[in-house]
């Protein structure tokens, strides 16, 4: 009802700003704060990002207790800058990367300890080696271990047995949903990145393994960035947006 009574101008930025200002004033009067979470923000249209930036700018000016916590792929920083030039000053951009070793150990060990289950040191080392500290992979492997074992002490052998099962789970879900809709040419680009050996890799090397000119693969690069599969790591360089995507392609495409 609130939205329908306010959002009448058919201007997304203006309507969204009006709604947030009213919500912010209600929250301020009630002595509470509003936190709005948005995931996968890289899929937003430019008009939607403009509306977000405009609305946040206005509630900040008015000192209203409204905040956003957004998550997205690396290209999001550029997208927000293109939507509104002042966006880079509005948002605090935090890179979410692999956990440092001490935090990875804590993520593995502490939840299990609460249920009187313990990991051997060798098991913890193997989990960190496999996951490279990436939080989602830790979650998936430890979930597989939890389902597969009823022992109160998780051994190295148990971890090694579960890594192949976790590979299957990741391949059929996490990785495949990102790759299945690629065209043959786009997949060729991704495979060429893997053949480069080191990541990030240069576009020149990708073009070499595709046996094409650098200029001719530019559209494929742009398409894959738009799909959220790769990002521009530096000038003339690209990398995968998710860890171990190269391992997935090696497994599924039989890349030497």
Indicate where each model-derived feature is located:
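Conserved Walker B catalytic segment
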Residues: 5-74, 82
């Amino acid at each position: 009802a609130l939205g329908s009574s306010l959002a009448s101008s058919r201007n997304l930025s203006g309507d969204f700003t009006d709604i947030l200002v009213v919500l912010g004033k209600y929250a301020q009067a009630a002595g509470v704060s509003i936190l709005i979470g948005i995931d996968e923000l890289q899929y937003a249209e430019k008009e939607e990002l403009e509306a977000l930036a405009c609305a946040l700018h206005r509630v900040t000016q008015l000192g209203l207790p409204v905040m956003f916590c957004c998550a997205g792929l690396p290209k999001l920083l550029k997208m927000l800058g293109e939507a509104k030039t002042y966006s880079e000053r509005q948002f605090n951009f935090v890179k979410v990367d692999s956990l440092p070793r001490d935090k990875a150990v804590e993520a593995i060990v502490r939840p299990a300890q609460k249920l009187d289950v313990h990991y051997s040191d060798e098991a913890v080392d193997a989990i960190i080696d496999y996951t490279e500290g990436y939080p989602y992979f830790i979650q998936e492997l430890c979930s597989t271990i939890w389902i597969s074992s009823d022992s109160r002490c998780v051994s190295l052998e148990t971890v090694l047995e579960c890594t192949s099962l976790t590979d299957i789970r990741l391949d059929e879900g996490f990785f495949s949903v990102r790759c299945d809709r690629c065209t043959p040419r786009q997949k060729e680009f991704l495979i060429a990145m893997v053949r480069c050996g080191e990541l990030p890799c240069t576009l020149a090397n990708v073009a070499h393994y595709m046996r094409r000119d650098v200029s001719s693969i530019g559209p494929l690069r742009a398409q894959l960035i738009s799909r959220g599969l790769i990002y521009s790591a530096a000038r003339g360089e690209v990398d995968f947006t998710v860890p171990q995507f190269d391992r997935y392609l090696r497994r599924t495409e039989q890349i030497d």
